Amino acid sequence: MSSPDSPTVVTLEAIGYLRNALATRVEAARQPRAAAGAAARIELLPGRNFEHALEDLASWELIWVIFWFHLNSGWRPKVLPPRSTTGRKGVFSTRSPHRPNPIGMSAVRLERVEGLNLYIRDTDMLDGTPVLDIKPYVAYTDAHPDAGTGW
């Protein structure tokens, strides 16, 4: 059992890796919607029955990619978002990659699935990014157009 003094340790394994031409953070868009058209491929690891896990995914137009910000070192409790006009914000109120657990998520356009490869567009991830999970984007539950924004 965990407590505030001894948090639960969680171990994750990558299910695959993102492949594209973006090698450094300055090359990538800050958000997937700002990366319109940016092509990439998710290469899933062989020998784990992922072929079966991919069944029916090709029928979805958008998917969520859950990933690890593998180039980050450390985290910051306060960050300066690019659009902030009022200074630093608590990291949990931002989309900053500098988090206690550097987990990211991006909604990307799924072009096609071929074997263990998912061809995607509109991605803000870098080459070699470890992919932790893939989920379909379900508009009626994932979109909240009436939601307000903070700051």
Where in this protein do the model-derived segments appear?
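Glycine-rich, low-complexity intrinsically disordered segments
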Residues: 1-107, 111-151
